[in-house]
Amino acid sequence: MFEWMKNKKAISPILALLIVLGVTIVVGAVFYAWGSGLFNNSQQSTQSALEGTTSTITYAAGAIGVGVPKEIDVEGDLDLTYPTPDYKLSHLTTTDYGSYDERLIVPVPLTLENYYDSTLTNVKIESDGATEVAGLTLKKITLNYNGQNYDAYLLCTNDGTPFKGILNRTGIYPDATWTGDDGNNYTSVYYILAPNSVTGVAAVDGSKDLSVTTAKKWPYSQNDVQSMRLYAGGFNNMWYACAVNGSYSSWTNTLTATKFIGWNTAQAFYKYKTPIDAKFYTSEWDVGTLHKGEKVSKEIFFFFGSSMGFQEEPSGETTVKIPVKVVSDQGVYKQVDVNIVLKDRL
């Protein structure tokens, strides 16, 4: 029945399918330093049950290299660590306009390298998520504004397509025109996470801490503030904002914007009872084809929100374990856990 397994050449692609990753993330401090990365390059052999069979095969542990930023992997053990976290996740609070929900996006940077002598195809990173935690689809882009370029992230649907239209707590409206509170019509509305110094849309009082102490005075105006952020290293957080009357080029991966507003951003991903924005959640991120010796970098994103039911532990510190694995047309990598530690100001 398993005659093909006696042929070493026939199972060679399967030998490439190992990923060893122990990821512990304590949200805070330095995050976005890729550096040269550290790669697990050992060639020792080990044993693993072939998925879907009762047979056992031997494979090379160093067939796939996994890199993480060296500044946060000081021991070279593929374990992400933030020894002095400076960020906190606040409680769900109440404002004059209703509940105020903190929403947090945590990126997990990975670098994969194919050390094997053949190509791996249709490589994907997959996750079943965790209780009350969702994978979010974002695309790193260049944001062009007033002739200057900035790093930013563009919100995409779960198939990786940049979203253009209206997104708020009432629904998702692709390619819709937005009539603002000023009476003007806005078209080509894209949703981005970018530095607040560029967009002018930021957390209340520009607080570096996620806990917003002035939530009860939440203003509804052109620069309507809101709380959803993406950690991008140190205090260089990126805030959620709308780029209106913009244009996106897939050729250059650039979004050109002329105006940023905050209308309705406070309501997006505030789920209430119906997950209307689930269109942006995903359980897998495409990596593509890995040729022999090829190295690629990939970020995956996890979203936390109190309105989804996510709550911190009474101690003020919560560790969330999220199962992650890598698959390809040639087989399945070993499943690992990504550990994200969130801290709350009690």
UniProtKB/Swiss-Prot annotation:
Keyword terms: Signal
InterPro entries: Flagellin/pilin_N_arc
Domain of life: Archaea
Residues spanning the signal sequence: 1-28
Protein name: Uncharacterized protein MJ1402
The species this protein was found in: Methanocaldococcus jannaschii (strain ATCC 43067 / DSM 2661 / JAL-1 / JCM 10045 / NBRC 100440) (Methanococcus jannaschii)
